[in-house]
Swiss-Prot record:
Protein name: Tachykinin-related peptide 8
PTM-bearing positions, type Arginine amide: 10
Protein keywords: Amidation, Neuropeptide, Secreted
Cell compartments where the protein resides: Secreted
Tissue specificity as recorded in UniProt: Brain.
Coiled coil: none
A Gene Ontology cellular-component term: extracellular region
Any single Pfam family the record assigns to this protein: Lem_TRP
Lineage of the organism: Eukaryota, Metazoa, Ecdysozoa, Arthropoda, Hexapoda
Main subcellular location of this protein, as a coarse class: secreted
Function: Myoactive peptide. Increases the amplitude and frequency of spontaneous contractions and tonus of hindgut muscle.
Organism: Rhyparobia maderae
Length: 10
C-alpha cells in the first residue's frame, strides 16, 4: 500500500 512509499506506489 501507499504507506510503504516506494513499494506501494505502484
Amino acid at each position: 500500500g501507499p504507506s510503504m512509499g516506494f513499494h506501494g506506489m505502484r
